[in-house]
Amino acid sequence: MTILEVGSQLIESAVLQMSLTSVLLTASVFTLTLGYFSKLLFTQHSSEHTKYPPHIPSSLPFLGQAVAFGRSPIEFLEKAYEQYGPVVSFTMVGKTFTYLLGSDAAALMFNSKNEDLNAEDVYARLTTPVFGKGVAYDVPNPLFLEQKKMLKTGLNIAQFKQHVEIIEEETKDYFRRWGESGERNLFDALSELIILTASRCLHGCEIRSLLDERVAQLYADLDGGFTHAAWLLPGWLPLPSFRRRDRAHLEIKKIFYNVIKKRREDTEKHDDILQTLIDATYKDGRPLSDDEIAGMLIGLLLAGQHTSSTTSAWMGFFLARDRALQERCYSEQKSVCGEELPPLHYDQLKDLSLLDRCLKETLRLRPPIMTMMRMAKTPQKVGEYTIPPGHQVCVSPTVNHRLQDTWAERLDFDPDRYLHDNPAAGEKFAYIPFGAGRHRCIGENFAYVQIKTIWSTLLRMFDFELVDGHFPPVNYTTMIHTPHNPIIRYTRRNTQPQQ
């Protein structure tokens, strides 16, 4: 083993054991050693006619608020809102972040154009090694929008009607292994199930049939590219997780290339997203290359996997904590679908209104992404303030979803709140788990179908409860805010649904 390999493994081991605060600190030191200390010499001077957002002071040069923010980001932002108002700036690791807190301030981001508030400058270094070149944030925004439109074409109601049957079948097959009762890691189980269901629904039967333990590990290695280290540290570092990510990317693309090649040679047309992409063309008439199709398939799967697995797990723990609510959801299955609980149909999902409200409330209290970011390319006016170019402009769904100004009993899990006055109806950006405006997630409708089908099936199969009253805290060390120590207790229901 070379000195370089030993060194990279030591760095990797350290990063894996770090909190967000520690990673930020390490990134700070690393950045300084690379010569970015010169940023300290840059001072932004306000003209007498320009008012910049209030800036939270720090006694730590360069690091700024990295320690305080990394320790407890939501509480940090809520305190900043109370002290400074809806627009506030602070420095971390030599970069200035400006948060737009609340519905009115958030409108700036969601109504913005990409040439003013740019997404590629923020996300490309994180997504390109995972999805590949030529797709998503690696291409000019107009091209990315064309790619999103192609994917959205394949996410339609006709497809969703087929997906319900597929997802129910996959869920039953997966959870048969759980036996009659026990305690299991709910998040891990749902993460695996989401990959299986999404692969079959979105990639097609050929790719789903290849999803064995080896391919599942490749997906896990690719998914390991979404870390604080990948966001903050240069991608060329020889960290073991970076090398695993890069190897997995190449291996998965090889698998996709073979499937795409066979599809192109097949005279029979299939009805799935893979076929949609094979048949699609850009506005200039150019068809998608195999590499672009493979990259878009990877992006579609992994982007949705995070949202659905995290949200599904949190929803399970909220229902396990409130047993009466869980029983109401189970009773709703019988009242909507039939006392004998026959197989689900797409048209029934919209009538499961209580389950829908439970999902909506889960997304309010535990939106999978804490912060949405853009890079300011031009001066941006918000209220009385001007955000200068170079600031990373951020909106936090988590904060918007629990502001006292908007939400009564803001920390309570109360699905029935949507039966009464719904703040999200009066404030356009008070509820934004999937973004909003031109930045809204294209997979939102599929996520609702997927999660509601999974939980309809699980409620029919099991009764859930917390283990000794333990409700998981939020794990802030990950890019997606997952439940920490997500063990749940379950007992299989005596009533067996019809097959």
UniProtKB/Swiss-Prot annotation:
Catalyses which reaction(s): a 14alpha-methyl steroid + 3 reduced [NADPH--hemoprotein reductase] + 3 O2 = a Delta(14) steroid + formate + 3 oxidized [NADPH--hemoprotein reductase] + 4 H2O + 4 H(+); lanosterol + 3 reduced [NADPH--hemoprotein reductase] + 3 O2 = 4,4-dimethyl-5alpha-cholesta-8,14,24-trien-3beta-ol + formate + 3 oxidized [NADPH--hemoprotein reductase] + 4 H2O + 4 H(+); 24,25-dihydrolanosterol + 3 reduced [NADPH--hemoprotein reductase] + 3 O2 = 4,4-dimethyl-8,14-cholestadien-3beta-ol + formate + 3 oxidized [NADPH--hemoprotein reductase] + 4 H2O + 4 H(+); a 14alpha-methyl steroid + reduced [NADPH--hemoprotein reductase] + O2 = a 14alpha-hydroxymethyl steroid + oxidized [NADPH--hemoprotein reductase] + H2O + H(+)
Membrane association type: Single-pass membrane protein
Gene Ontology terms describing biological process: cholesterol biosynthetic process via 24,25-dihydrolanosterol; response to yeast
Sequence positions that bind heme: 441
GO annotations of cellular component type: endoplasmic reticulum membrane
Name of the protein this chain belongs to: Lanosterol 14-alpha demethylase
CDD domains according to UniProt: CYP51-like
Protein's pathway: Steroid biosynthesis; zymosterol biosynthesis; zymosterol from lanosterol: step 1/6
Compartment(s) of residence: Endoplasmic reticulum membrane; Membrane
Transmembrane segments: 13-35
